[in-house]
Amino acid sequence: MAKEIFSIAAVFWILIPIGLVGGALLLKFQGD
C-alpha cells in the first residue's frame, strides 16, 4: 500500500514540472 502511494507520488513529482515547463514553452512560442 505505502509502496503504491510512494510510486504514484514520484510519478506526479516528475510529471507536474514537465507539464508546467512544457506549457510555459508552448505559451512562449505561441506569443512569438
Swiss-Prot record:
<keyword id="KW-0812">Transmembrane</keyword>
<dbReference type="GO" id="GO:0009055">
    <property type="term" value="F:electron transfer activity"/>
</dbReference>
<comment type="function">
    <text>Component of the cytochrome b6-f complex, which mediates electron transfer between photosystem II (PSII) and photosystem I (PSI), cyclic electron flow around PSI, and state transitions.</text>
</comment>
<dbReference type="InterPro" id="IPR012595">
    <property type="entry name" value="PetM_cyt_b6/f_cplx_su7"/>
</dbReference>
<keyword id="KW-0793">Thylakoid</keyword>
<comment type="subunit">
    <text>The 4 large subunits of the cytochrome b6-f complex are cytochrome b6, subunit IV (17 kDa polypeptide, PetD), cytochrome f and the Rieske protein, while the 4 small subunits are PetG, PetL, PetM and PetN. The complex functions as a dimer.</text>
</comment>
<keyword id="KW-0813">Transport</keyword>
<dbReference type="GO" id="GO:0009512">
    <property type="term" value="C:cytochrome b6f complex"/>
</dbReference>
<keyword id="KW-1133">Transmembrane helix</keyword>
<dbReference type="Pfam" id="PF08041">
    <property type="entry name" value="PetM"/>
</dbReference>
<comment type="similarity">
    <text>Belongs to the PetM family.</text>
</comment>
<dbReference type="GO" id="GO:0015979">
    <property type="term" value="P:photosynthesis"/>
</dbReference>
<keyword id="KW-0249">Electron transport</keyword>
<protein>
    <recommendedName>
        <fullName>Cytochrome b6-f complex subunit 7</fullName>
    </recommendedName>
</protein>
<feature type="transmembrane region" description="Helical">
    <location>
        <begin position="9"/>
        <end position="27"/>
    </location>
</feature>
<keyword id="KW-0602">Photosynthesis</keyword>
<dbReference type="GO" id="GO:0031676">
    <property type="term" value="C:plasma membrane-derived thylakoid membrane"/>
</dbReference>
<keyword id="KW-0472">Membrane</keyword>
